[in-house]
């Protein structure tokens, strides 16, 4: 028998199956809602349960379950539906009690198959302190990427709002991106609460997915604000560029190259401060002038040396800063073209052209950052210090900026932590399937060598 928990005054098995009748969205279709313990609810029409029974599990259950409920003459619909409900509940209970090693059963119910003892791994005391997907309510889709989606979630006990990034292990393996995901995890763990880098609260996994629980930033992407306003003032652009430079300088101190700076990876918080997110393309262990040669990044912001497949160093991030600063002021990246090959040719060969509508310090900064020869690029000698000391940033009080004591030039309209008005409708309209996102954990965490040591808990923010 499974473990017990209290529901009101009744003692309930943790893996007890309940089935209820509900009406579908069309108010006509009868739907059977199955729930295991206090887990997420799975809603399907009767025919789906019957098909699953006939095609996948018929041989796993006693003969009494092979007799399907049939409507008798003069029998009321209510009685007929109730018979179906009881049949579904009893069959599902039998399968959950006896067949959780079956892949078909686990897939249908979105539960974890128990592993043999020699396949389990003790992840230490922090494993118990960390969260699982079942500790959260999934509220809204707020982002989408190559390997998964980002959700606004609410912790059931504390009611705190977070962003949860959920990635598919299968997709990550197919694209050979395991190293990048683990690098992202390592960078997030070592952020040490930098004011302009998103913080990780928890990371955990199950058989199919990886989960990052992060700060929820609902002031909107810099990209969205830039699209709406076309361009920013020089003063506002300076504020954002200073924050970005601080974040990049901090990563460089930790021997990390970011490699994917772009407006889509910069989020505003409710106070109007920028926060750098998405560390999937970070390169670790880049001490001093050490170089690497992996071709990666976003086309519009690639430095010439990356396009030419030459060795590159930390100065690629300063090229990206120049590109983003240019875009904030003029509305498009500096060498933009819809044709990538044409754009690459411009990045490599075309001289930088700047309008005379900006100040001399701004012109000099962008020119220095977008120097095609990385050995002459601003930041090559003293990294962040070169950027910080540039005349363009003379109005910036760096200590007050890092302490978040400066008033932001723009404060987004945010009502509360759950406000999603600054999130793209493209994401918000994506339907959520809680049962697949938070499968019932019927066993200890299984060993996964590809993602070993992925699990993390910020001990200063333990939830449970």
Curated annotation (Swiss-Prot):
SMART domains attached to this UniProt entry: S_TK_X, S_TKc
Alphabetized UniProt keyword annotations: ATP-binding, Cell membrane, Cytoplasm, Developmental protein, Kinase, Magnesium, Membrane, Metal-binding, Nucleotide-binding, Nucleus, Phosphoprotein, Serine/threonine-protein kinase, Stress response, Transferase
BP GO terms, sorted: intracellular signal transduction
Metal-binding is among the record's keywords: yes
UniProt domain Protein kinase: residue ranges: 136-393
Annotated compartments: Cytoplasm; Nucleus; Apical cell membrane
Catalytic activity: L-seryl-[protein] + ATP = O-phospho-L-seryl-[protein] + ADP + H(+); L-threonyl-[protein] + ATP = O-phospho-L-threonyl-[protein] + ADP + H(+)
GO molecular function (one): ATP binding
Activity regulation information from UniProt: Phosphorylated and activated by pdk-1.
Catalytic machinery residues: 260
Cofactor needs: Mg(2+)
EC numbers on record: 2.7.11.1
One GO CC term on file: cytoplasm
Domain called AGC-kinase C-terminal: residue spans: 394-464
Domain of life: Eukaryota
InterPro entries hit by this protein: AGC-kinase_C (IPR000961), Kinase-like_dom_sf (IPR011009), Prot_kinase_dom (IPR000719), Protein_kinase_ATP_BS (IPR017441), PX_dom_sf (IPR036871), Ser/Thr_kinase_AS (IPR008271)
Main localization category: cytoplasm
Name of protein: Serine/threonine-protein kinase sgk-1
